[in-house]
Amino acid sequence: LLTDGMVVVGVEYRLSPHVKTMEIVDDAAAAVAWVFDNIGKYGGDTSSIYIAGHSAGGYLVDMVGLDKKLLARYGKDADKLAGIIPFSGQVITHFETRNQRGLKPLQPTIDETAPLYHVRNDCAPILILSGDREKELYGRYEESAYFYRLFKLLGHPDVTLYELGGF
């Protein structure tokens, strides 16, 4: 990718059960803020920052890109992202959060820790990727489709849902 003029930053974050879900989300926000502050040193451009992640990473990029308070803590504006690319990210309250609260694994919940709670029509362009609806983790495609539909209903100008074959 570097030969194509792209800089890729892979980040680490603390894991459950050692920390709560929102601490993990804050780790992701801190990492994105670091990218804004430092990408120029590596040949990157702050106007071309895309955030992407798979599964838990998909959840994290949704939260960081949609809940403006997360990056604002670090003096950054989530609307300055060039794009958000979640792949198979959970958009209801994360199962780990539900587990921490003693809820049943399949009990759907939507609160301030859920990307669905923060859907808005003025965020960065968003490309929602999902695996095959018949093979994807339980309910994940349906969550992604609902997420997409809410963006459309709110009038987001640049949202795409793409279902990958297989998986």
Describe the predicted segments one by one.
Residues 1-10:
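Short amphipathic alpha-helix adjacent to the substrate-entry channel of hydrolases
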Residues 2-3, 37, 121, 153:
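Residues at the C-terminal ends
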Residues 9-11, 87, 162:
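The conserved SAM/SAH-binding core of class I Rossmann-like methyltransferase domains
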Residues 13-17, 91:
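Alpha/beta-hydrolase active-site loop signature
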Residues 16-18, 164-167:
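Histidine-bearing beta->alpha loop at or near hydrolase active sites
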Residues 30-100, 110-111:
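Primarily recognizes the serine-hydrolase "nucleophile elbow" in alpha/beta-hydrolase
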Residues 75-97, 106-145, 149, 153:
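The feature captures the conserved acid-bearing segment of alpha/beta-hydrolase catalytic domains
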Residues 148-166:
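Catalytic histidine neighborhood in serine/cysteine hydrolases
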